Amino acid sequence: MRPAKRIGKLTTARVTAVTNDQGTNAKIVAAGTVPWRIKSGQLQVLLIHRPQYDDWSWPKGRLDPHETLPETAWRETKEEVGLRLTLGIPLGVIRYKTSNGNNRKEVWYWAARVIDQRPKPDANEVDETRWASVEEATKLLTKKLDKKPLKVLAEAYEAHHLATIPFIVLRQAKAIPAESWTKDEVDRPLADSGYTQAKAVAKLLRGWAPTRIVTSKYTRSLETIAPFVKKYGGAVRNKKWVNLRTVKAHPNFMAKRLRTEFKRHEPTLVCAQPSVTKRILKEIKSWVREDRHAVVNPKHVYTEKKSNLSPGSILVVHRATHLSGKIVSVERYEPYVN
């Protein structure tokens, strides 16, 4: 597939208190992170030096074939500085024309916290890394545009929005049609295209590394999460409140259990049937409204047309670890499937 056409297929929507990113609008698209840590009570960020350009910037790179933007950001950070990080809140997009002036380029950024890891430059594209305070980084960065994600990160830190825990909602991948299945509905499996979606979403989920995985006992839901669990691990929990019958019979119970899962202090993934994910999204939408000062323009993620997820797609909600526990970002993505 031609790069421009491939990029045009990306489904991306992200909102935070200060960013609002809707889809791609450039021939060249890249993604990266601003790695950060707290050292002696001070916020520090990790910059990289690229010998080819003799500049200081952030870990980033262009999309590989069959990648989504979050996957690119995660992979490039691992390749350039040897860090396996969990993606945090979005830090916006920088846009500019390439040096020859013929093409528009976008770079999508995420915050990524570093805990108990030491950066290792790849000695090819990156020959040096340096931890710096926000003030030092502002002076050290070569390109003015690279200061934009740093500014967003610093503002999030001051607002207690930077340290977060991801909560992910995954709609099960495409199942074979109900009318063509004669056995127990619980055992209805994924379609061939659904298995392909499940493998693709496993790569996408890697960026947030959920360790607790909640799903129903339905075969198609279990098959959706199977590729991720097999490759990356995670504790799978079969819960009745995720079953459609339970949700229909006891909607308040579902809402209560959902809130309990959301408040856990570990990255959590909930995988469910389409009717259930639609109700989950409706519930989360009400939480976003309650925390509306922390997320701007949630309508770009929640509209009538976007009231549910497509098969195999995800909603990522970040909750601040600060005492307020506010929702500080909402993102939705589809896995890349040929």
Regions found by a protein language model. Give the residues of each.
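Short, well-ordered beta-strand micro-motif
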Residues: 35, 47-49, 109-113, 131, ...
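Nudix hydrolase/Nudix homology domain
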Residues: 2, 54-55, 119-177
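Conserved Nudix-box catalytic region and its N-terminal flanking loop in Nudix hydrolases
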Residues: 41-84, 181-188, 193
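Conserved N-terminal beta-strand and adjoining loop/helix that marks the start
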Residues: 8, 13-45, 166-168
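Active-site-proximal alpha-helix that buttresses catalytic centers in soluble enzyme cores
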Residues: 61, 72, 162-249, 278, ...
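Unchanged
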Residues: 63-89, 94-145
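A short, acidic, amphipathic alpha-helical segment used as a generic capping/interface helix at domain edges
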Residues: 249-266
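Generic beta-sheet signal
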Residues: 166-168, 264-272
